[in-house]
Structure formats: C-alpha cells, structure tokens
Design a protein with these regions (language model features):
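Conserved beta-strand hairpin/beta-sheet module of binuclear metal-dependent hydrolase folds
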Residues: 2-60, 64, 152-155, 159-163, ...
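Structural motif
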Residues: 41-43, 71, 135, 159-162, ...
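Active-site neighborhood of phospho(di)ester-bond hydrolases with catalytic His/Asp-centered motifs
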Residues: 45-47, 69-77, 97-100, 161-165, ...
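FMN-binding flavodoxin-like domain, especially the glycine-rich phosphate-binding loop
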Residues: 173-213, 217-220, 262-278, 288-385
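Metallo-beta-lactamase
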Residues: 2-5, 98-150, 194-200
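Short acidic active-site motifs
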Residues: 84, 284-288
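Short N-terminal or domain-adjacent regulatory/targeting segments
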Residues: 214-241
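Active-site metal-binding motif and surrounding structural segment of the metallo-beta-lactamase
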Residues: 51-98
Length: 385
C-alpha cells in the first residue's frame, strides 16, 4: 500500500490472535503497522509482532527493490512493535536504530541477548530532527501515551504524523467495521487512564499541519481528520460522546434485572435518546467499560454479596476508576435480602473520582421490588432525563 509517493505500508495482519494484551477480545484480528520512508536515506518505522517477522521483512524487501534501509525508528517498545529488532539487524547489520534513552533501556530489558553497538544506535531527544533527504522527521516525545518511552514522528514534507499507538484500533486492516467503535474500545481499555498525557500530545499536534495519520494499529487516516482528532479530544478529556443512559447490572435471581428492565422501559417512554443495558455477567467487560465512558449518565444496579457488592460489579467499577473515570452522573440501584451493603460499597468506590454527580434518587430493594421501589424507579427515570 502506497501512502504517499515516498511512504509505503509494510505492516501485517494477524488473524490468529484471540486476545490482545492477553485480555481484549479481537474477533477481527489485529494489524501491526510498519512503514517505509523511501528517500536518499531510507527509514523503517517500527517492527511488528514476533510471529510475523519473516512476512514483515519480505514486505520491506519487496518495496525497496534491493535498496538497503539506513534507519529503524522505534517509537514504542511494546513487543508487538519491537520484537523484530534483532531479526532486522541480522538482515541489515549496518543500520542505525533510532530511539530515545528509555527506548534503549527497554531494548536491553526485552532482548537480553541483543547487544547494540554504538554505531548501530542513534539516540534522540524531544524535538530532535532527522533529515533523510527531502523528508525531515521531527521526534515528539509522548510519555505515557501509553508507555514512558513513546514518541511520535512528524514528517514535514508529506505532512504525516506517525502516531505510535495513538489513533489505533482493534481489528485487522481487511476487517470492514466502524472506526469509532473499535477505536473507542481500544482507547478506553489501553490508553484511557492517561487522558492528561493525550491532551498534551493533542496540543502539540494542533501546531502541526497534519494531512495523514499513520498509527501502529488500524487504518491509515487520510480524510476527515477533524473527526478522529475530535474523538480523541472528547475521550481524553473524559467528556460525553453520546447522549443517553447506560445501565450496568448484576443479578443473582433475576429481581435486580426486573428493576433494570423497568427503568429502561421508563427511560424509553420518556424519550431518552439511547438506553444501553449491560449484564456484566454475560457481556464483554471491555465493551461495558467502553460504554460507561461513552455516555454521560450511568446507573449501577447490583446485589449485596458476602457483605460486599457482587464481584463482577466490583470489577467493573475498578476498571472505571483505574482509568480516571470522571465528569459523569451516576445513579444507584441496590438489592439485598438483609444487611444491604451494595449501594454504600459502590458509592464509596468512586470517592476519589473527579466531578461525579450523584442522582438524588436511589433505589433500595429488599429481595424483590415493592410499590415504593417502582415509584422510585419512575422518579429516577425523570431525574435522568
């Protein structure tokens, strides 16, 4: 795939993977992106997962037609982007690996047998440039987006931002699917904790004339960049992307579920633009976390369990708070047959979260709904509108 006259795609698709980072379901696989900048000096941007080293090297050889690369630029050291450094050096022993100080420390930690000679290293600092000929690359450090060594690279000639894991998504490149959905799930799950750091990177990006974004996962972005950047701004500022209400629940014998179904019915009757109901025991946790960040209002409904809150609800809330969940309105429905604790526990788990607005109405069920519970659900629906 040719991106510009001089920039070519040499990445790979992975349709064998079932879990990304050991936890995220990827039914449409993953793409590990790598790029060649073909100039007087030739640069290769990042490597790919270890399982695809031979395919990647063949892709590079095919586009270079016998030419030899001069630089291997490592923007991010996660193994799905750096695992083939040694293999690359075996084929091209005279190249320079370009990275920052943290990059080279991590290379040593991940590849104990790889001893990079000084002549094979080019250490760069923030805002350093590298001239390939017509192309001048500027390296912009982006620590904790989402690892400490991350840097992005801007090519001023073709106005391309090589964005590391930023603007990435789940799914191989041959998967036909909506960008927003799988990019949102990727962002929230993997980068979501680091909103402040993403905001810092977006401020730098705003000073650049960007016409193309080349991420390490997902498609190359060439059109409607305002949309993609706008989405990243919303996600990283913990804003509301879509109007509506998410209801996340756990239910042991179905009584809490009945309360949730009644609330969803009332919201729809009142014209709520979107009601998303998620059974945390049966639906993908990453999808649930994604929706919790997407909508501005959420209702948590759960049972007391062993003097605590039901375990899957606890896990769900932990996923939210560890990703700096904030700027949301939350309502609570709790159920307990005696000594109900779920509401208190759920609320307490958000005590360090910023800018949380609690609904005045809460619902406390004793085993099964009574008329007062139904009235409270009606009132909660009104308050959510």
């Amino acid at each position: 795939m040719r991106i510009t006259d001089d920039i070519l795609y040499v990445g790979v698709n992975d349709h064998n993977i079932d879990l990304f980072e050991g936890q995220y379901i990827v039914p449409n696989g993953m793409a590990y992106n790598s790029y060649v900048i073909n100039d007087e000096k030739i640069a290769v941007m990042d490597t790919v997962d270890a399982a695809f080293g031979d395919e990647w090297l063949k892709n590079i050889a095919d586009v270079l037609n016998g030419a030899t690369p001069d630089y291997l630029i490592i923007q991010h050291m996660e193994p799905d982007h750096s695992a083939n450094i040694q293999k690359f050096l075996e084929v091209y022993p005279n190249i320079k690996v370009v990275g920052n100080a943290k990059t080279f420390t991590m290379i040593g930690n991940f590849s104990r047998d790889l001893k990079l000679a000084d002549e094979n290293k080019l250490e760069v600092k923030n805002k350093d440039t590298l001239t390939l000929g017509k192309h001048e690359l500027t390296f912009v450090f982006a620590p904790m987006v989402h690892w400490p060594e991350v840097m992005v690279t801007y090519d001023s000639k073709d106005k391309v931002l090589f964005s590391a894991d930023g603007f990435g998504k789940f799914g191989a490149l041959d998967a036909e699917e909506d960008w927003d959905c799988e990019a949102r799930r990727y962002y929230v799950g993997i980068v979501g904790k680091y909103g402040a750091q993403v905001q810092n990177l977006l401020k730098v990006a705003a000073t650049l004339d960007i016409q193309t974004i080349c991420p390490l996962h997902g498609p190359v972005l060439t059109e409607n960049l305002e949309h993609y950047i706008g989405q990243y701004n919303t996600w990283s500022s913990y804003g509301t992307e879509s109007e509506g209400v998410m209801i996340a629940y756990t239910s042991v014998y179905g009584n809490t579920k009945k309360a949730v179904e009644l609330l969803a019915e009332k919201l729809k009757e009142k014209g709520c633009p979107k009601v998303v109901v998620t059974d945390l025991a049966r639906e993908d946790m990453a999808e649930a976390v994604e929706d919790a960040f997407r909508y501005g209002k959420i209702v948590l409904a759960s049972t007391t369990y062993n003097g605590d809150v039901f375990p899957l609800m606890k896990t769900f809330i932990e996923h939210l708070t560890e990703r700096n969940y904030q700027n949301k309105t939350i309502g609570l429905i709790e159920n307990g047959s005696w000594a109900s604790m779920a509401g208190k526990v759920m609320r307490g788990m958000f005590e360090k979260s910023k800018n949380i607005t609690w609904l005045e109405t809460s619902v406390k069920i004793m085993s099964s709904m009574d008329e007062q519970n139904k009235a409270d659900i009606e009132k909660m629906a009104e308050e959510l509108m």
